[in-house]
Amino acid sequence: MVREPFNALSHALGVPLALLGGLLLLLLAPREAWPALLAFGLTMALMFGASALYHTLKAEDRLLAWLRRLDHAAIFLFIAGSYTPFLAEGLEGGDKALALALVWGLALLGVGFRLLY
């Protein structure tokens, strides 16, 4: 039995839709934009996948708490993934490198914090 049917279904549907949308973006974009668009599409799919797992599984409290932390950690990654195309295409040189390092560094700190606490 599914723990939260609507959330589970809507978030599970988000995974293939995110992958399909990401693929369409790749087909429409120049090759130099592909790494940033891959970060966007894959982190979106990861976020929906982690959320679908959390909302689907009926499990003991300890496992649910871990899945909830994974769900929240994936949100940090998607925030960085959604900034990436804008920063990669909108900035140049050192500004781009600094902004990407800052956004991804903060996201990884958030992931680490959320997985540990």
Task: Label each PLM-derived region with a short phrase.
Residues 1-117:
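Multi-pass alpha-helical transmembrane bundles in non-GPCR membrane proteins
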